[in-house]
Amino acid sequence: MPIIINLDSVLEKRGMKSYELAEAINITTANLSILKTGKAKAIRFSTLEAICNVLKCQPGDILEYIDED
């Protein structure tokens, strides 16, 4: 998959655990895990906005495009 989710590195920089983020953005830890592992097929803008708001980051800090060519 050419879209990489760098959520773990941003969480580590902020000193926050996954369960804390899940609680703060009101999603289950299971759904956050699916997102973090790249198994999610999509992400709602409202979820991305909530993540960025809590982590004080930009979407580009979390999402990365890798050209597979």
Where are these regions (language model features)?
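Short, charged recognition helix plus adjacent turn
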Residues: I34, K41, L63-D69
